[in-house]
Amino acid sequence: MRPSRSTRRHLISLLLFLFHSETACRPSGKRPCRMQAFRIWDVNQKTFYLRNNQLVAGYLQGPNAKLEERIDVVPLEPQLLFLGIQRGKLCLSCVKSGDKMKLHLEAVNITDLGKNKEQDKRFTFIRSNSGPTTTFESASCPGWFLCTALEADQPVSLTNTPDDSIVVTKFYFQEDQ
């Protein structure tokens, strides 16, 4: 019996996380972490912005366009990365709450992550590209994906049903110039 594609993907992601190479970014090691800024927007053109200390996705136009949050990234491996905002001072994390996963913003400097692999796992996301779009899966809870609601100005969250028609899990992710 062949394992499903989803099972293989989760196994590969887990192995990459557990046995990442020596060329990976190491804050206290051989190679310094390099934070990069990216623009992110979902396939419905909603961008991320901060409202009442919560990351939300909506349509920003005119003078509000300056509210768009850039996503700060520190790569661990080609597919594994830490995500943050506010110049890496607030990091996205996945925290279990009952039987669901919740997306949190934690006041942690993104360049300080990577020193404690087990503790940092909640901040780690697996980036998967499919054509022009990207998905972000939680490394600490495989099967949970970063998502936006179909409606504008709703919190960015996590879903374990990425194909559900009420959420958007595909994003355009472009390095900021």
UniProtKB/Swiss-Prot annotation:
Residues carrying covalently attached carbohydrate according to the record: N109
PROSITE patterns documented for this protein: INTERLEUKIN_1 (PS00253)
Pfam families referenced in this protein's UniProt entry, alphabetically: IL1 (PF00340)
Coiled coil: none
S-S bonds: C91-C141
Signal peptide: 1-25
Swiss-Prot/TrEMBL keywords: Disulfide bond, Glycoprotein, Secreted, Signal
Cited Gene3D superfamilies: 2.80.10.50
GO MF terms, alphabetically ordered: cytokine activity; interleukin-1 receptor antagonist activity; interleukin-1 receptor binding
GO BP annotations listed: inflammatory response to antigenic stimulus; negative regulation of interleukin-1-mediated signaling pathway
One annotated Gene Ontology cellular component of this protein: extracellular space
Compartments (UniProt record): Secreted
Biological role: Anti-inflammatory antagonist of interleukin-1 family of proinflammatory cytokines such as interleukin-1beta/IL1B and interleukin-1alpha/IL1A. Protects from immune dysregulation and uncontrolled systemic inflammation triggered by IL1 for a range of innate stimulatory agents such as pathogens.
Family the UniProt entry places it in: Belongs to the IL-1 family.
Protein's name in the database: Interleukin-1 receptor antagonist protein
Protein source organism: Oryctolagus cuniculus
